[in-house]
Amino acid sequence: MDLHSFSRRSFLSVGALTLFGRFRLGEALALRAAAPGSSPKPENLSIILLWLAGGLSQFESWDPKPAAKEGYRSKFGSIPTNVTGIQVGELLPLSARHADKYTIIRSMTSQDAVHESAQAFMLSGHAPRSTLQFPSYGSVIAKELSPRNELPPYILTGGPVRKWEQAAFLGPKYNPFLADDPNKENYKVRDLDLPLGVDWARVDRRNSLLRLADRQFRRMDTVGIVDAMDTHHQTALTLIRSERAKRAFKIESEPEKLREKYGRTSLGQGCLLARRLVEEGVRFVSVRSGGWDHHFNLFNDISTKKLPELDRAFAALLEDLNERGMLGTTMVIVGTEFGRTPEINVNDGRDHWPAAFSLVVAGGGVDGGRTLGATDQNCWEVVERPIHVPDFIATIYAKLGIDYHQMYQSNVGRPVRVIDEPFEAVQELLT
């Protein structure tokens, strides 16, 4: 059969096959838009990112300021951890028991106070520019390090995928695989099973037709949409055939007691799924949690919902990884795009404050039981060991053995550094 013998119906059937009827125009257009201690050996290291979108308040979490002046001081106090001299916010009692496993960076600093661009900066190491979208470090990791098996090297939970989490000019091959929300009832990842009434013989026939169509349309494709669709299609086929993938995503096989320990929340079950994925060889898993932009009603929301969810999930993840002997080869990062203002506003909230904020890094050969850097008494500014965003991203690449001085070619042929300069990897996290 050649292309000219296709009927309209045959062609539509091929189109439907690409994602078994689930690849819609919006997804196609999105792909089109995306197209323009003793450290472990880099090849053995995996990363789990707990991404707190909106801007976590450092006052109520990792950098409490009980001596801050009135109007700045949190309504919640600080508590000791299992490491002498280190305190965290009182809403993190479970995490406080594991301080020996993590480093608190209290001196992150940036100038970007806008959510979208600040997230893009924190997830790429590039200050955003209007003319160019930069790849996330998850996508760079997927490109630079070979997949360990048939599972995607970069997986994201809590979708939908934002543009700053994508591969940009590296191409759709390195976009994250979206695992949706594992806390949903009857959770199931799409594309892991054949649709009802479709067998492998039918799939193979349609796959042959699709390859034939691809050859023709690739000649007319100037923006990479065919490559994008083909990448998504081939990923789907690979996962459907993979028993490893089915096993990895089967979160319901976990003991009920363990699921409850992580917390029956999107963040908690996302962390549990991340552990399962890393256990099966996935290199980078991003667990996204939204709702951290507390301009209003900070103290009620962060005490009744957000920080208890984080505390439970993070502590359970560290304990689980440690008990399974995986913490040494799994780096866990608790990240956010910026901090919150020292001054409490009239709405009982805090506004955006990139000048001084906190991150946490655990495992992956990073020594625990310490803090890095410091802010002043009211957390207006960093007063000790400032760490800039590109410094932190360079550190991640260094841990993975990725050359962070290399140059890429953008989609318009322009040379682009993998990270904005100047930067310096954080040596305290490498030794």
Predicted regions and their residues:
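Ligand-binding pockets and gating/stacking loops
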Residues: 1-431
